[in-house]
Amino acid sequence: MISGAGAVGRHLASDLANRGHNVTLIEQDPAVLEIAKEWAPQVDHMIGDACEPWVLEKAQLNTADVVVASTGDDEDNLVTALLAKQEFGVPRVLARVNHPDNEWLFTEQWGVDAAVSPPHILTAMV
């Protein structure tokens, strides 16, 4: 399951689906979800807020092997990660860190197995 159907989420969803993975993409903005449907028609699309437990239950998160919280909002990504790990027992949870100052929060205590911080990755590559 991937939360956030912006550029990062929809590209990731498409790539994973093309590699044979079953992917559910959750997005709360209908306009953004419509773009994702065109970009990645081979994945399941769901309108909703991934910070809401009932949305994750409807997405059958308890059967997911991996969750990627890829929204542009760090708080939302942390809430989604924590719910995925604590409430639904997802084995592997990855989260996008949008603001480097928040990276210290993205730990196993918050349900995050691996945090991805694009600014730090780019800095490390220079």
Labelled PLM ranges:
Residues 1-126:
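Cytosolic regulatory regions of ion transport systems
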